[in-house]
């Protein structure tokens, strides 16, 4: 994985976590989790579903869909992945 793709992935997950945006997480086996991203690392994502946190391996993920539109652009998401602060677009 290139640094740019890692930054986009990290920025996307970090934005969902930081802004407490609910998401539907689709797994490769077809199962869906609807909840909140609580944390992540290189290999796993912690998802809170119905008040309980589940640790899901990234290789089991297919798609993550936010419940509402994200308030920022892709370039801002990438900056969030690099640890920079991101402000919403007007």
From Swiss-Prot:
Q: Which UniProt keywords apply?
A: RNA-binding, Stress response
Question: What are the GO MF terms of this UniProt record?
Answer: RNA binding
Does the keyword Translocase belong to this entry?
no
Q: Which GO terms describe its cellular component?
A: cytosol
**Among the record's GO biological process terms, what is one?**
regulation of DNA-templated transcription
The record's listing under InterPro entries reads:
Hfq (IPR005001), LSM_dom_sf (IPR010920), Sm (IPR047575)
Domain Sm stretches:
10-70
Entry's PANTHER family? RNA-BINDING PROTEIN HFQ
Family that this chain belongs to: Belongs to the Hfq family.
Q: Which NCBIfam families match?
A: Hfq, PRK00395.1
Oligomer and partners: Homohexamer.
Q: What does this protein do?
A: RNA chaperone that binds small regulatory RNA (sRNAs) and mRNAs to facilitate mRNA translational regulation in response to envelope stress, environmental stress and changes in metabolite concentrations. Also binds with high specificity to tRNAs.
Record HAMAP family:
Hfq
Report what the protein is called. RNA-binding protein Hfq
Can you name the source organism?
Symbiobacterium thermophilum (strain DSM 24528 / JCM 14929 / IAM 14863 / T)
Query: Which lineage ranks, top first, belong to the organism behind this chain?
Result: Bacteria, Bacillati, Bacillota, Clostridia, Eubacteriales
